[in-house]
């Protein structure tokens, strides 16, 4: 469920503002999206894992709040981010 160090480095290299950037909203949203995708795959096989389902809903809410913040601060960054992550089909 959690991200390995290699996965985090790869995500941060792709979405962070610089190499060691972990705090920018883009980096946080990208890491949350990876965790959400992994949890969604887990829940497809373990349908009755309600504890993990609640965790998934919390992650989705956190990502939604971060995306709302990015949209409020800079719409161009928001549109670029959702396009790169493949959100909002």
From Swiss-Prot:
GO CC term, one of those recorded: cytosolic small ribosomal subunit
Domain of life, per lineage: Bacteria
Record Pfam families: Ribosomal_S15
SUPFAM superfamilies in UniProt: S15/NS1 RNA-binding domain
Single annotated GO MF: structural constituent of ribosome
GO biological process: translation
Protein keywords: Ribonucleoprotein, Ribosomal protein, RNA-binding, rRNA-binding
CDD domains for the chain: Ribosomal_S15p_S13e (cd00353)
PROSITE patterns found in the cross-reference section: RIBOSOMAL_S15
NCBIfam families, per database record: S15_bact
Function text: One of the primary rRNA binding proteins, it binds directly to 16S rRNA where it helps nucleate assembly of the platform of the 30S subunit by binding and bridging several RNA helices of the 16S rRNA.
Family, as annotated: Belongs to the universal ribosomal protein uS15 family.
Quaternary structure (record): Part of the 30S ribosomal subunit. Forms a bridge to the 50S subunit in the 70S ribosome, contacting the 23S rRNA.
Name of the protein this chain belongs to: Small ribosomal subunit protein uS15
Organism for this UniProt entry: Mycobacteroides abscessus (strain ATCC 19977 / DSM 44196 / CCUG 20993 / CIP 104536 / JCM 13569 / NCTC 13031 / TMC 1543 / L948)
Lineage, top ranks: Bacteria, Bacillati, Actinomycetota, Actinomycetes, Mycobacteriales
Gene designation per UniProt: rpsO
């Amino acid at each position: 469920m959690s991200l390995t160090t290699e996965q985090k480095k790869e995500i941060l290299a792709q979405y962070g503002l610089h190499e060691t950037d972990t705090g920018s909203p883009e980096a946080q949203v990208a890491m949350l999206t990876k965790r959400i995708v992994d949890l969604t795959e887990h829940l497809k096989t373990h349908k009755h894992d309600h504890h993990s389902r609640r965790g998934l809903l919390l992650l989705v809410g956190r990502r939604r709040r971060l995306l709302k913040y990015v949209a409020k601060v800079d719409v161009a960054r928001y549109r670029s981010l959702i396009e790169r992550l493949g959100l909002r089909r």
